[in-house]
Amino acid sequence: MMKKNVININPCEKIESPKLKKSLPKVLNVEEVNKLLNYEAKTALEYRNKAMLELVYSCGLRVSELVNLNVNDINLNECYVSVFGKGKKQRIIPISSIALKVLDEYIKVYRPTLLKGYLTDKLFLSSYGKGITRQGFFKILNEI
């Protein structure tokens, strides 16, 4: 109506748009968390899975942060992980002793067998020797 010069003032000018509800992410219950943390690892891939689960739980990482980690982002001597999160902000996060033990063994014993001749700095590798993806992590989580 303003464009056609029927009215001079926009009657909706001071009306605020309704706020959309943000849905909370699905969280695991205590039983589900215990099941994940008590995951038994026997193979290189299972040990990788355990290392990922321990690190996510211990450090409160987002899945995107986890799958983008490189080997040099983990400092085993100083017990921390360096993460680039949302907005490319760097965070230094301490790693629990349990997660550190699992990560140490994964990096030294199991990760080299997963490389399959590829050269990559990615910390967590797929069965093809390349960096694991978000979808790959969620698939693993659903299988456990």
Which residues fall in each region the model found?
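Conserved catalytic core of the tyrosine transesterase superfamily
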Residues: 1-144
